[in-house]
């Protein structure tokens, strides 16, 4: 093969090969043989050659470049080895864990200290010990950027990297003992133990380590920190409050056994646990004296709002008021589409019509058809507040809810045909078509529907309305003016084809160049 390449090289004179490469921009040819490679001195390469070589994993060529650099070959003076590119490639290959490429890049001039020693920091952060050691051997500063390397190696649980960096003098106590705080937060017990053996302060930042280890459920770390004197009641019993929030029952039980106050911060622990659906924690806290009814039955209300049926049932059995805060629970369960909770609350006496039938209005707004149907069956007034339910369902594009409400005699034309005007404004073509089939007036409010559909770029709606007789020139050619202002060129062109005047009114279309 080498013979054939050499023969090919000799077919044409070098100056012709140079023209071929310059014209085509194709550098592959220059990478097949040393004869061709020499032409780099003469061609005007339009791409980053080193990046190309690294991206295509052409390690043999990198080796060859290293040899040329050692020999001080004239080609090395050619600017196809830009330092900026080398530095970027060095960092990229630290991330990819390519030690072989890293070595070649450094040998041909990459600066390991570029970007505040980003290479060694990144290798430490990722736990690539062999790369960290090599970079250090080449002069990397492991303490750059406030000991970033050891901090992030600790944060990510890379014990061997941490030990190595400490052996080189890295400061584990920098930034108020960030290393042990975040190793604790992330549950890396071996790193935590090592850092404390090196005199890290576990009580830094108001006992951050034990607080965050508790919050994230790392029971082994919590126990270890407590054995060293960490204060579990710091920051108003943060540890138990947030362990409860995360549903970490084992941590919660352990903290209570050590005297954590389950009622701190107005019974935040049980409120958080209820809000997030952690039934086991809720039951345990209640057994330890937590008040499930604090703050106007907050725990029950949040459990209902967030769809945690088992918690809701349990709290109701503990005597909470299902109608607290003007029936907040059933209103928010309806708004968020939690049908089973709605049914249960109704069975317990919740008033679905509170706050002017808020429940059915918001269920309609969010498209929760089954909830809407159930509420109607329970006597909700879907016509309250000027048929707000169907207006909101139409505005938000919930066709099946719209159809159901119409079947129950909702008025689609209320409020000057609000439903079709806002369905058009928001581009809900299927709702628009259905409302038209039910007798909605597309020209209501001075052709509001086509004007707003145009303004918001809903071409399909615009075409449909125009086909039904909507006036594209209404209100001094509002439609084309605002479609232009908002950059909806497809709508603009269509409106112009239908006779819209681009020079009327404030000349928006003309200003935009149409």
Curated annotation (Swiss-Prot):
Source superkingdom: Viruses
ANK repeat ranges per the UniProt record: 45-74, 84-114, 115-144, 146-174, 176-204, 205-234, 236-264, 266-294, 295-324, 325-354, 356-384, 385-414, 415-444, 446-474, 476-504
InterPro entries: Ankyrin_rpt, Ankyrin_rpt-contain_sf
Pfam families on file: Ank, Ank_2, Ank_4
Keywords: ANK repeat, Repeat
Family matches, as SMART domains: ANK (SM00248)
Protein name as annotated: Putative ankyrin repeat protein R863
Originating organism: Acanthamoeba polyphaga mimivirus
Biological classification of the source: Viruses, Varidnaviria, Bamfordvirae, Nucleocytoviricota, Megaviricetes
């Amino acid at each position: 093969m080498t013979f054939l390449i050499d023969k090919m090289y000799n077919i044409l004179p070098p100056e012709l090969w140079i023209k071929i490469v310059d014209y085509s921009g194709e550098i592959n040819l220059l990478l097949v043989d040393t004869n061709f490679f020499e032409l780099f001195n003469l061609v005007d390469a339009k791409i980053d050659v080193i990046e190309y070589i690294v991206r295509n994993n052409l390690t043999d060529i990198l080796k060859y470049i290293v040899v040329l650099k050692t020999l001080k070959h004239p080609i090395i003076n050619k600017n196809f080895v830009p330092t900026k590119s080398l530095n970027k490639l060095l960092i990229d290959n630290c991330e990819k864990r390519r030690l072989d490429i890293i070595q070649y890049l450094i040998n041909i001039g990459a600066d390991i200290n570029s970007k505040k020693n980003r290479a060694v920091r990144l290798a430490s952060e990722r736990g690539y010990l062999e790369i960290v050691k090599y970079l250090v051997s080449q002069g990397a500063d492991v303490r750059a950027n406030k000991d970033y390397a050891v901090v992030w190696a600790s944060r990510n649980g890379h014990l061997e990297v941490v030990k190595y960096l400490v052996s080189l003098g890295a400061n584990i106590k920098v930034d108020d003992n960030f290393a042990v705080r975040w190793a604790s937060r992330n549950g890396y017990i071996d790193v935590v133990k090592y850092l404390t053996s090196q005199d890290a302060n576990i009580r830094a930042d108001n006992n951050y380590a034990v607080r965050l280890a508790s919050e994230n459920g790392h029971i082994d770390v919590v126990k270890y920190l407590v054995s060293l004197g960490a204060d579990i009641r710091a920051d108003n019993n943060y540890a138990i409050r947030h362990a409860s929030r995360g549903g970490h029952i084992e941590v919660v039980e352990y903290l209570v056994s050590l005297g954590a106050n389950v009622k701190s911060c107005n019974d935040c622990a049980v409120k958080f646990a209820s809000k997030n659906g952690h039934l086991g924690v809720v039951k345990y806290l209640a057994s330890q004296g937590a008040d499930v009814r604090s703050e106007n039955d907050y725990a029950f209300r949040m459990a209902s709002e967030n769809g945690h049926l088992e918690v809701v049932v349990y709290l109701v059995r503990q005597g909470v008021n299902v109608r607290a805060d003007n029936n907040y629970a059933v209103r928010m369960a309806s708004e968020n589409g939690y049908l089973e909770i709605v049914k249960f609350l109704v069975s317990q006496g919740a008033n679905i019509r509170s706050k002017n039938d808020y429940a059915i209005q918001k269920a309609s707004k969010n498209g929760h058809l089954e909830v809407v149907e159930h509420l109607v069956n329970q006597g909700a007034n879907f016509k309250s507040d000027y048929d707000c339910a169907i207006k909101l369902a139409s505005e938000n594009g919930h066709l099946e809810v719209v159809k159901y409400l119409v079947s129950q005699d909702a008025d689609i034309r209320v409020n000057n045909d609000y439903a079709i005007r806002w369905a058009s404004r928001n581009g809900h073509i299927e709702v628009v078509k259905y409302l038209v089939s039910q007798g909605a007036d597309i020209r209501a409010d001075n052709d509001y529907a086509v004007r707003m559909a145009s303004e918001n770029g809903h071409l399909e709606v615009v075409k449909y309305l125009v086909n039904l007789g909507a006036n594209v020139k209404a209100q001094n050619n509002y439609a084309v003016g605002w479609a232009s202002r908002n950059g909806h060129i497809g709508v603009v062109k269509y409106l112009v084809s239908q006779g819209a005047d681009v020079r009327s009114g404030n000349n928006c279309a003309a200003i935009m160049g149409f």
